[in-house]
Amino acid sequence: MTTYKDAGVDVEAGYEAVRLMRNDVKRTFRPEVLTDIGGFGGLFGLNKDKYSEPVLVSGTDGVGTKLKIAFLLDKHDTVGIDCVAMCVNDIVCSGAEPLFFLDYIALGKNRPEKVAQIVKGIADGCVEAGCALIGGETAEMPGFYPEDEYDLAGFAVGIVEKSKIIDGSKIKAGDKLIGLASSGIHSNGYSLVRKILAPTAKKLAEEIKMLGTTLGEELIKPTRLYVKTILDLKEKFEIKGIAHITGGGFIENIPRMLPQGLGVKVVRGSWPVLPIFTLLKDLGNLDEMDMYNTFNMGIGMTIAVDAEIANSVVEYLNKDKEQAYIIGEVVSDKEGLEIC
């Protein structure tokens, strides 16, 4: 008799994975969570009395080919942080507080301990972002993915008062652009990274002097979460626009927050470019503009504020929360982005 397990799908392994992840999932729960693990849908009680006109904000993203680094390192407990960060950093650009998160893990073979490590990272990211992990799917897909590989994606939902949505509409010429430091490459550009470095397990274990760590540790660094910083900052200062520097780097993402007819001049040298980007540029013989069109270059998020408060915002951020820099200015003479 042929069984589902004979076809490569181990239902019992799925049950074991759920058992192992249970405590991590439950530590993300907020009081609004109305379900336990294992339901068909995650229930979340929206406290709409806190808002006059509540607006839900959603976002979805994945970790991309950074996962190939995790496979080589056999390290799976931080890529979940990347997954959460990619989603919640997007929705906080609208000023939204993340409420809950769902994950999707597709893999060639369900190894419960590995799945539990992935979910631990997701839970760590959710705790840092203040959102609840209320659902997920682990899909074992033999013959579709290699046994030791998986893909990881997530979905976040947040809320913002309609009158407090940050949409860039108030940005004007003369406003300053503030950059918040990244932790490293984050989760974009890894196809180019892998082409340049051709990483192997042996290469990833090598100590790189200019990085101050091994290549593997540098490449696997989790994406920085900016949620608590932005939610705190917007209660104290008027933030006119926010751009999450992801795929497309500076050149694609910063103009997305600008009203039509405006552009940005970014001042080269106004923040420290991280050594990993210098290494990639040198080894790959990359054009500088290609770098700015692919990587975050050491700045993971940018915010636009009135020029009169820019120094105060930077000073506030640098007290103990972030490394922040005034990196440019909004202009009216040219649309798009210029590095000068």
Swiss-Prot record:
Keywords: ATP-binding, Cytoplasm, Ligase, Nucleotide-binding, Purine biosynthesis. Its EC number is 6.3.3.1. The keyword Repeat does not apply. One of its GO terms (biological process) is adenine biosynthetic process. It catalyses: 2-formamido-N(1)-(5-O-phospho-beta-D-ribosyl)acetamidine + ATP = 5-amino-1-(5-phospho-beta-D-ribosyl)imidazole + ADP + phosphate + H(+). GO terms for molecular function: ATP binding; phosphoribosylamine-glycine ligase activity; phosphoribosylformylglycinamidine cyclo-ligase activity. Its main location: cytoplasm. It is found in: Cytoplasm. InterPro entries: PurM-like_C_dom (IPR010918), PurM-like_C_sf (IPR036676), PurM-like_N (IPR016188), PurM-like_N_sf (IPR036921), PurM_cligase (IPR004733). HAMAP family: AIRS (MF_00741). Belongs to the AIR synthase family. This is Phosphoribosylformylglycinamidine cyclo-ligase. It comes from Acetivibrio thermocellus (strain ATCC 27405 / DSM 1237 / JCM 9322 / NBRC 103400 / NCIMB 10682 / NRRL B-4536 / VPI 7372). The gene is purM.
